[in-house]
């Protein structure tokens, strides 16, 4: 089954939205509308099968007490709370997993069997539960026949002691793949009456559920060292670099990412309200280095050579990302699949880059070396992309503007 996806530019999308809003505003007037100018577009909202609701009450009864207890203790988003809910659902015969793929799926063999029947073009059905960290779960009712997979997606949210269905929609999966890395990935455009009333359209969904188990130590290493960095507006895990040669690692992106961790507040150096004006800040040497130096074994001189440093007034020039440097807000994540303890006290983590948005459980693999510190902190030592003919490009990333590009766009503004 081929992936059919409508891609659109994030920036162009903003322009389209603005244009539609202008039309909406300009359409308001004292003159009565002319009936013969009104046209109607009808989209067939797929009916939600009644049998998809049959086991919902049973599922709610299984886990409602756990949600009530977690809410009372203000632990509804706690990992161990989610684990207990997933395991409880599994004990009652349901394949279940968490929405961040941090907990082993229960009853994975049922999902594997269903995937095999999809490949064999046999008829089958299954319910899979995805427990959210926002206080609820998504119930996927899947039905396959002739190699096609129909999805009924229902979201249930816990609130004030009750679990209520917020929205239900359905679609036929346009992309379906049970990957060699143990992920079930599927996507499509789903419709619901509630959504259509608000948007007059459907919503794209890209689902990635880890079916095969993963060692808990690997998950802990991911949560401790890789997930806090991630891939949003930085290239730490995209380019090759090490302590002897930091290469193309962008320390301004690192400053953006690490500033809130060090100062426990949002970064104050923001873009100008006028999108046509490029903001420029001079950050005191100590303030800038306090963010970077704890996370890298790098001296001031080397850091200055990788940035724009003003020796006269001892400041780092800093230009926040502007409109031309925004990214579409869909990102992959790194998942540790192995590690080595090195003789010098460092750890070498081997990880796959998983990108649900494009249905790829291994965009590429990379090795990250980290140095755990006695104070509980960490220094990042290196990153290396593992060469492979199957490696894909990092389509989610927008690099910062070069000095030349910045001048061409903003000039002396």
What kind of region is each of these model predictions?
Residues 1-3, 21, 108:
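Intrinsically disordered, low-complexity regions enriched in Ser/Pro/Gly/Gln/His and often acidic
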Residues 2-14:
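Bacterial N-terminal signal peptides that target proteins for export
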Residues 14-21:
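Sec-dependent N-terminal signal peptides
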Residues 24-27:
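C-terminal motif of bacterial Sec signal peptides marking the signal peptidase cleavage site
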Residues 29-31:
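Bacterial signal peptide processing site
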Residues 33-413:
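Mature, Sec-exported extracytoplasmic domains of Gram-positive
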């Amino acid at each position: 089954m081929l992936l059919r996806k409508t891609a659109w530019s994030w920036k162009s999308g903003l322009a389209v939205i603005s244009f539609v809003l202008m039309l909406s505003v300009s359409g308001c007037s004292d003159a009565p509308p002319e009936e013969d100018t009104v046209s109607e577009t009808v989209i067939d909202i797929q009916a939600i099968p009644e049998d998809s609701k049959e086991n919902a009450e049973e599922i709610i009864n299984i886990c409602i007490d756990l949600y009530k207890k977690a809410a009372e203790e203000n632990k509804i988003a706690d990992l161990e709370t989610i684990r207990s809910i997933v395991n409880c659902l599994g004990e009652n015969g349901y394949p279940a997993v968490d929405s961040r793929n941090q907990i082993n799926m229960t009853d994975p063999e049922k999902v594997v069997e269903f995937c095999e029947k999809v490949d064999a073009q046999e008829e089958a059905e299954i319910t899979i539960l995805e427990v959210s960290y926002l206080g609820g779960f998504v119930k996927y009712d899947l039905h396959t026949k002739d190699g096609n997979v129909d999805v009924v997606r229902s979201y249930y949210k816990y609130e004030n002691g009750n679990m209520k269905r917020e929205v239900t929609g359905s679609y036929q999966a346009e992309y379906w793949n049970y990957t060699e890395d143990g992920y079930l990935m599927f996507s499509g455009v789903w419709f619901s009456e509630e959504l259509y009333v608000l948007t007059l359209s459907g919503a794209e969904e890209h689902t990635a559920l880890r079916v095969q188990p993963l060692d808990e130590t690997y998950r802990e290493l991911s949560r401790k060292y890789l997930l806090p960095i991630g891939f949003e507006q930085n290239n730490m895990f995209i380019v090759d670099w090490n302590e002897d040669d930091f290469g193309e690692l962008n320390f301004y992106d690192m400053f953006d990412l690490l500033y809130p961790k060090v100062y426990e507040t949002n970064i104050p150096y923001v873009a100008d309200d006028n999108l046509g004006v490029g903001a420029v800040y001079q950050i005191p040497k100590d303030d800038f280095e306090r963010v970077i130096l704890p996370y890298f074994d790098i001296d001031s001189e080397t850091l200055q050579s990788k940035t724009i440093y003003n020796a006269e007034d001892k400041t780092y020039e800093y230009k926040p990302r502007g409109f031309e440097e925004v990214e579409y807000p869909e990102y992959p994540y790194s998942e540790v699949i192995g590690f080595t303890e090195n003789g010098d006290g460092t750890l070498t983590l081997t990880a796959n880059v998983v990108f649900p948005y494009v249905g790829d459980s291994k965009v590429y693999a990379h090795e990250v070396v980290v140095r755990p510190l006695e104070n509980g902190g960490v220094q990042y030592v290196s990153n290396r992309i593992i060469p492979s003919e199957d490696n894909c490009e990092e389509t989610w990333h927008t690099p910062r503007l070069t000095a030349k590009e910045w001048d061409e766009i903003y000039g002396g503004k």
